[in-house]
Amino acid sequence: MYSPTMPTMDSVAKFKAALNSERGALGPFMITSDPAFVEAAGHAGYDFALLDMEHGPGSFQNLQNLIRAANVAGVCPVVRVPRGTDIWIDRALDVGAGAVLIPQIDTAEQARAVVSAAKFSPVGSRGTC
């Protein structure tokens, strides 16, 4: 069943294909609470819209609206979470992020921890209902 807050497989597949292409993936870095800007990015043909929750003005409710706009426009919602805390990673994925960007990772141990936080058990530590 389709949920308007979950990224469409087309937008995620388009983003992954662009990442692996010679051109690379193109998308704006967005510090906004206005879904219209995210929708415009999709209609402009970008591969992703990077939604900044580290420095941006948004809440989880606002993030859900931004993600919904990305899905309407067919652009992959990539969410930059603050400092890679497990709760932010979990909630960003729960509200429909197609990918997460984790800032300020300095060690391999930190990288392993955030990968684990993004994956469900038994592979990772992300919680389930």
Predicted segments, located by residue:
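Glycine-rich, proline-tolerant flexible connector loops at the mouths of alpha/beta enzymes
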Residues: 37-65
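Short, ordered loop/turn segments at secondary-structure junctions
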Residues: 53-56, 82-83, 105-107
